[in-house]
Swiss-Prot record:
Residue segments, region Disordered: 1-42, 272-295, 560-599, 612-633, 666-753
Reported induction: Induced by exposures to biotic stress (e.g. nematode and Botrytis cinerea) and abiotic stress (e.g. salt, genotoxic, wounding, drought and oxidative stress). Repressed by exposures to biotic stress (e.g. Agrobacterium tumefaciens) and abiotic stress (e.g. hypoxia, cycloheximide, 2,4-dichlorophenoxyacetic acid, AgNO(3) and aminoethoxyvinylglycine).
Tissue occurrence: Expressed in root, leaves, seedlings, vegetative and reproductive shoot apical meristems, seeds, floral meristems and all floral organs.
Gene giving rise to this polypeptide: SEU
Annotated spans, Dimerization: 321-563
Protein name: Transcriptional corepressor SEUSS
An MF annotation (GO) of this entry: protein heterodimerization activity
Biological process, per Gene Ontology: cell differentiation; cellular response to external biotic stimulus; DNA damage response; embryo development ending in seed dormancy; gynoecium development; plant ovule development; regulation of flower development; response to auxin
């Protein structure tokens, strides 16, 4: 709106008759301030809808000086021509009646007198025509040369919000002829307008016209709005030129054209208003269509970020919802844990006395904090953590607290944040119990500050019971004790015995209540609830089946079908991978070769039995006198005897049962059978009785076959042996340990496999040593030598079967010789020594194996390690 300060006074003029203006008097015309030629004023409506309008001609002052304005000019209809400067888009806003041809009160910038009481004199038609012609000529010139400059000035003036500083419009002397021409055209138009009848406006139109007067120009917000304004002004200029060039059209047609123009202006103004609202939407659409969204920037690491994230984790866990729903825990795990995260609890430092049922196997679990072997612990993956959190708080846990020492935080090469606490205390709060665990905590965060690994290695834990639970029980127990003491002191007759009995019962009941209050059935030996441990056990089962589950998802098959097609794993330990088809075919070939070798060995054994009969006949003479003495062997020789002379007639089945019994119950009693200075431990050698089937010494090919498999072949021709004093088979003697090893392997396959490897190594070394010494009989079992004869015995690779070597200094064993003190006949053809005389072999059941002392010490250390592994196994678990 136009400011309301008083206008500058306008200079004197001449009176204009009302007949020229087509008016009959009316309300006084309100005064207006001076406006430049480039800015149109806001319209003002009076009582009679009178309006003031400033024309766009630069030389208006000459015209206004020759015209007089009456105080009241309702609906004045003076048509003004446009000047050379551009018209404002608001110049046609706010007309009343025939407002397209309505003239306004013209105020000259040069005038300084008062408007009221002054009138302009009449001008002649020639002067008006000259004025119009001059304006028309100037219009064409100024439109060509100053269009862009005038638009810029107008926009700056509108945006500035004021009209200050606008200079007056000067009249040039060369424009007189143009003014006369314009005056003639204007006079003709005035005559035509006087002939028009009065136009009656409807109330709706009047209201619309009043609303149009209040349209405000919005500031420019974009280049598109500026372009629309320029286009609007060009259209207005063209329309004004059309009005001047079409004087012969009917007033009705002119009114229709004017209404169309007004509608177009309103639409353009609405577009201009909507442009600021559309502007913020355009960059979003452009970004969605052309530019991809940038990924969120990773947070730059700063010291202390890991500890701060841990604080947020504990705070969020404490402020869980009351209903403890699973959806909250799923969101919690997704927010604070990585998709492949693991949470581990190590209890390796507790010792073997604690109950560790359901934890990981000892050979699989490994803790990088304590590095204890064997280790024990629990592990849960990110898929199980939501359910684990829910069960923990459902099983009685009210709150879980974490107390930590000074952190040690660092960032590794992969961008992960490692947070370590050398001292950490985790406390689980129950209703009547507190479980406090001391240990070390290590947390690994991913670059986006999500927990990748959580490891808590507990050293110990304490179960704390509140005093308020124990004080009543202790008080009751003390009062019962006092009553019992008083009753016992006052008991002088038999009538006091019932009272003593009642007090005693009360004392016992109070003690039981106290013991019950001290018990903590809520948690196990490790300080975890039963439901919590059960969930961890299920988690371990699921983790072990994860490969099968992934295989089922990849092949899109059902569980049963996937289990049938899933590659099986064979072997004593489940950790070993399954055999390939090529390995299976190789095993079949080896089995076939083994069967062929067994047949050949049976034939060789039959031949050797015949040769052995001659040896057994020579040894019968001295057998009865020395059998008992040699069965009860001297422990200083290092020979382990698991039986006495009375057990010589027992069968192999009873000995095998004894082996199993000793292996299961006597793991810790090996020291009773083994002397302290013996470098070997393990099972005692169980020998075959004379009544059992015996075989001859196998050939080297049979030994090679039986060493890796550690199994003794059975022979159907053994029953044909007529002699009861035949030498037992080496393989049969050596196989006495295999039933115990197989049954022990059922309990712990990994331990048995390690012992088998050591024994196989012993047998292979024996075979190599015996082959280098010329080939002699081989026996399996514990072995050792006397100090007197050890030097001579080690000089050959002979194993003494069925007896013990005499403590003779002249004992000499040769490939073709015999013992000293007797005549030995050599059987060089078969490599078997015929032993006669006082030093002949006894009918004992111990085979002595000759080895190098250094090799014996190494093998002894290996056997001791294997036995210690058996002893450390928790058989009660």
């Amino acid at each position: 709106m136009v400011p309301s300060e008083p206008p500058n006074p306008v200079g004197g003029g001449e009176n204009v008759p009302p007949s020229i203006l087509g008016g009959q008097g009316g309300a006084p015309l309100p005064s207006q301030p001076a406006f430049p030629s480039l800015v149109s004023p806001r319209t003002q409506f009076g009582n009679n809808m009178s309006m003031s309008m400033l024309g766009n001609a630069p030389n208006i002052s000459s015209l206004l000086n020759n015209q007089s304005f009456v105080n009241g000019i309702p609906g004045s209809m003076i048509s003004m021509d446009t000047s050379g400067a551009e018209s404002d888009p608001m110049s046609n806003v706010g007309f009343s009646g025939l407002s397209s041809f309505n003239a306004s009160s013209m105020v000259s910038p040069r005038s300084s007198g008062q408007v009221q009481g002054q009138q302009f004199s009449n001008v002649s038609a020639n002067q008006l025509l000259a004025e119009q012609q001059r304006n028309k000529k100037m219009e064409t010139q100024s439109f060509q040369h100053g269009q862009q400059q005038s638009m810029q000035q107008q926009f700056s003036t509108v945006r500035g919000g004021g009209l200050a500083g606008v200079g007056p419009v000067k009249m040039e002397p060369g424009q007189v002829s143009n003014d006369q021409q314009h005056g003639q055209v204007q006079q003709q138009q005035q005559k035509m307008l006087r002939n028009l009848g009065s136009v009656k406006l409807e109330p709706q139109q009047i209201q619309a016209m009043r609303n149009l007067a209040q349209v405000k120009m919005e500031p420019q917000h974009s280049e598109q709005s500026l372009f629309l304004q320029q286009q609007q002004r060009q259209q207005q200029q063209q329309q004004q030129q059309q009005f001047l060039q079409m004087p012969g059209q009917s007033p009705q047609a002119q009114m229709n054209i004017f209404q169309q123009q007004r509608l177009m202006q309103l639409q353009q103004q609405q577009l201009l208003k909507s442009m600021p609202q559309q502007r913020p939407q355009l960059p979003q659409q452009f970004q969605q269509q052309n530019l991809p969204l940038r990924p969120p920037l990773k947070p730059v690491y700063e010291p202390g970020m890991g500890a701060q994230r841990l604080t947020q984790y504990m705070y969020r866990q404490q402020h869980r919802p009351e209903d403890n729903n699973i959806e909250f825990w799923r969101k919690f795990v997704a927010e604070y844990f990585a998709p492949n995260a693991k949470k581990r609890w190590c209890v390796s430092m507790y010792g073997s006395g604690r109950q560790t049922t359901g934890v990981f196997p000892q050979d699989v679990w490994h803790c990088e904090i304590c590095n204890r072997k064997p280790g024990r612990g629990f592990e849960a993956t990110a898929e199980v953590l939501p359910r684990l959190f829910k069960i923990k708080y459902e099983s009685g846990t009210l709150e879980e607290l974490l107390y930590v020492d000074m952190p040690r935080e660092s960032q590794n090469s992969s961008g992960q944040i490692v947070l370590e606490y050398a001292k950490a205390t985790q406390e689980s709060v129950f209703e009547h119990l507190r479980v406090v665990r001391d240990g070390q905590l290590r947390i690994v965060f991913s670059p986006d500050l999500k927990i990748f690994s959580w490891e808590f290695c507990a050293r110990r834990h304490e179960e704390l019971i509140p005093r308020r639970l124990l004080i009543p029980q202790v008080s009751q127990l003390g009062s019962a004790a006092q009553k019992y003491q008083q009753a016992a002191q006052n008991a002088t007759t038999d009538s006091a015995l019932p009272e003593l009995q009642n007090n005693c019962n009360m004392f016992v009941a109070s003690a039981r209540q106290l013991a019950k209050a001290l018990e903590v059935p809520l948690v196990n030996d490790l300080g975890y609830t039963k439901r919590y441990v059960r969930c961890l056990q299920i988690s371990e089962v699921v983790n072990s089946m994860k490969d099968l589950i992934d295989y089922s998802r990849e092949t899109r098959t059902g569980p049963i079908e996937s289990l049938a097609k899933f590659p099986r794993r064979t072997g004593p330990s489940s950790a070993l991978p399954g055999p390939s088809p090529q390995q299976a075919s190789d095993q079949l070939r080896q089995q076939q070769q083994q069967q062929q070798q067994q047949q050949q060995q049976q034939q060789q054994q039959q031949q050797q039995q015949q040769q052995q009969q001659t040896v057994s006949q020579n040894t019968n003479s001295d057998q009865s006198s020395r059998q008992v003495a040699l069965m009860q062997g001297n422990p200083s020789n290092g020979v382990n005897y698991a039986f006495n002379a009375a057990s010589a007639s027992t069968s192999t089945s009873s000995i095998a049962g004894l082996i199993h019994q000793n292996s299961m119950k006597g793991r810790h009693q090996n020291a009773a059978y083994n002397p302290p200075n013996s470098p070997y431990g393990g099972n005692s050698v169980q020998m075959q009785s004379p009544s059992s089937s015996g075989t001859m010494v196998p050939s080297s090919s049979q030994q090679q076959h039986n060493l890796p498999t550690f199994q003794s072949p059975t022979s159907s021709s053994n029953n044909n042996n007529p002699s009861q004093n035949g030498i037992p088979s080496v393989n049969h003697m050596g196989s006495t340990n295999s039933p115990a090893m197989q049954q022990a392997g059922e309990v712990d396959g990994n331990e048995s496999s390690s012992v088998q490897k050591i024994l196989n190594e012993i047998l292979m070394n024996n075979q190599a040593h015996n082959n280098s010494s010329g080939g002699s009989m081989v026996g399996h079992g514990s072995f050792g030598n006397d100090g007197k004869g050890q030097a001579n015995v080690n000089s050959s690779g002979v194993l003494l079967m069925n007896g013990q070597v005499n403590n003779n200094n002249n004992t000499n064993i040769g490939g073709a010789g015999g013992f000293g003190g007797g005549i030995g006949q050599s059987m060089a053809a078969n490599g078997i020594n015929n032993i006669n005389g006082n030093n002949s072999l006894m009918n004992g059941r111990v085979g002595m194996m000759v080895r190098d002392p250094n090799g014996q010490q190494d093998l002894g250390n290996q056997l001791l390690g294997a036995v210690n592994g058996f002893n450390n196994f928790d058989w009660n678990a």
